[in-house]
């Protein structure tokens, strides 16, 4: 997205025409099985953000590697250092499915209807400005569940039972309307997908996240 973090459209899912061009140039078509590889404990869950966005664009056969890049290396799978050269292809996206997307406008309008979950680090939640946010803090009343709490010490997802208990112990129920956010909608996309996997169906990733909210909304510390 053009501009900088915190701008009105920065961090949002691209419009269908833009996304068609982006994915088409990479040869990522809907008839392929797509495997996404990222980092878990050492990253922000970029693979989940891509999965979340591809699903919204109508891609159905998309998977992530549990444990990420480290798990693949530890398994002994063959890797290479040379960059791949994708072959461009035609991609058609009729519309974006916004059923698991939260917008700034909706959150401002109906804030009290949602339970808000901040998945950033302790430092960020408590007010540290680490990534050029307009101000520090967290959304008013936000429940704090760290993104890294989704994983065991080796970087693999915890069991559904462990995760569900963690969410419920934090004050969430499967009937709640839940909004996840982080700095730029990446870690929160991972958390939204995991919550959905655990049966929390009414979950929404706030893709603009704190970068935008710090510009337009109130925060607590």
What are these regions (language model features)?
Residues 30-33, 60, 112-115, 140, ...:
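Loop/turn elements at helix/coil->beta-strand transitions in domains of secreted/extracellular proteins
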Residues 165, 175-221:
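C-terminal soluble interaction/assembly domains
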Residues 27-30, 47, 109-111, 135-138, ...:
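Extracellular/periplasmic catalytic domains that process cell-envelope and extracellular macromolecules
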């Amino acid at each position: 997205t053009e501009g900088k973090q915190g701008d009105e459209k920065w961090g949002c899912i691209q419009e269908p025409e833009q996304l068609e061009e982006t994915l088409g140039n990479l040869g990522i078509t809907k008839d392929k099985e797509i495997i996404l590889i990222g980092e878990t404990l050492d990253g922000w869950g970029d693979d989940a953000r891509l999965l979340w966005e591809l699903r919204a664009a109508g891609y159905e056969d998309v998977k992530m590697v549990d444990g990420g890049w480290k798990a693949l290396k530890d398994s002994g799978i063959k890797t290479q250092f040379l960059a791949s050269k994708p072959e461009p292809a035609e991609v058609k996206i009729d519309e974006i499915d916004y059923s698991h997307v939260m917008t700034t406008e909706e959150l401002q309008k109906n804030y009290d209807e949602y339970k808000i979950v901040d998945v950033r680090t302790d430092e960020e939640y408590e007010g540290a400005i680490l990534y050029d946010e307009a101000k520090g803090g967290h959304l008013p009343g936000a429940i704090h569940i760290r993104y890294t709490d989704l994983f065991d010490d080796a970087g693999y997802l915890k069991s559904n039972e462990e995760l569900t208990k963690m969410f419920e112990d934090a004050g969430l129920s499967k009937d709640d309307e839940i909004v996840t956010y982080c700095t730029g909608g990446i870690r929160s996309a991972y958390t939204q997908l995991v919550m959905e996997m655990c049966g929390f169906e009414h979950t929404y990733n706030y893709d603009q996240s704190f970068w935008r909210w710090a510009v337009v909304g109130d925060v607590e510390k």
